[in-house]
Amino acid sequence: MKLHRFAAAAIALCISAGAYAQSTPPDSLKKAPTPQQIHSASKWYDKISLKGYAQFRYNRLLESNPDLRCDQCDKGIGGKQGFEFRRARLVLSGNPHDRLFMYIQFDYSSDASSTSKHFLQIRDAYFDYSFDKKKEIRVRFGQSKVPYGFDNLQSSSNRLPLDRSDALNSGTPNERDFGAFLMYAPEKKRELLKRLVEDGLKGSGDYGVFALGLYNGQSANKPELNDNLHVVARLSYPFQIGNQIVEPGIQAYSGQFTLAKDQLSTGVKIKENATYTDRRAAFSLVLFPQPFGIQAEYNFGESPAFDAETDSIRVQKLHGGYITASFRTKAGNTTLVPFVRYQVYDGGKKHEADARLYDMNETEIGVEWQISKNLELTLAYAISRRKYDDFKTAYNEKGNLLRLQLQTSY
């Protein structure tokens, strides 16, 4: 009964308010705000969005050799490892001004040491300024991905294999560095690059069809150790042939890399300033999966690498690449993408202990199940052989393992 009385009173109040509004002279009413007033009232922080993704992994199913590991790929591979967050990201992005774009990405699964996990760390922090209204020409300042290699530029949330290739990723560890980059792409090409990601075709994102940049060269979140900047250039041109989209590309970088003291073993022989030539060039070719897809890259160059015969670090030749084949198909309301990747690399890894000299090859066979827009499950079986030398270790292991990843996007 009390509820009925409350409802009746509320209805009566609404009717009275409506009658009062109708009887009020038009002069006393406030005018509705114009679109210009609404626009001017909006604040820059109203244009900032928040998004992210997380990757939960287990790498030890059907493991044949617990001594097989890969520091560059995933430290969760190998003995005494268990469940892990490989990545857990939060992104703040938006346009505080019509020609200014900001992008700040945090990772809250970073390891501070082998015994301390899940620290918050900046991955990206940059600003793009566009010189024209169409935003075809822009300059980027800050810590960002270096435009070298499709595999490096493609977000890990879009990549089919669980880790980037050794050959391309060893050139730009963590894919990122601090610098300034000039990018150009016609408006229609920018729309195509955006669509390749939004339509689930595993695009790399928009780094222009041409990019030119200067960056420190010591990798992300690390201080500059010499007076030489790296220079990088990339030309990549996506185009459509019938129902297929193809993107060929070429890129190169050159600079001087300085080995940090904490990555050198006592007794290893190095140059007086520990600074070495570091340069590479790479070719890329991508056929986006509609339904069959191919992604292939190969790079070559020279960089610091350990020489076991002289117990020294010197500049040595390097080469290697990968090829990934995939097939995208619908399964009810979900999408299945089976894939296979073969990769090979022979050369140094400048960012590892004593600039280890590697000789590796690996085949990965897997399937990505896109359960929904926000949930994906990937199973991947790896057949791997890894050999490297540093001052303390002559490592040579091979083995197989089944890996599982659950990815959520938010």
Regions picked out by a protein language model, each given a short descriptive name:
Residues K2-R69, Y410:
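N-terminal periplasmic/intermembrane-space "pro-region" immediately following the signal or transit peptide
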Residues H4-A7, V91, Q343, Q405-Q407:
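Residue-level detector of intrinsically disordered/flexible regions characterized by low predicted structural confidence
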Residues C14-I15, Y108, D307, I383:
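Alpha-helical transmembrane segments and their juxtamembrane interfaces
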Residues S16-A17, F101, E309:
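Hydrophobic alpha-helical membrane context
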Residues T24-S28, K43-D46, L61-L68, G76-I77, ...:
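Outer-membrane beta-barrel pore domains
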Residues Q37-E63, I77-G217, L225-V232, S236-G242, ...:
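Outer membrane beta-barrel
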Residues N221-H230, P248, L259-K261:
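Surface loops at the rim/top face of extracytoplasmic beta-rich domains
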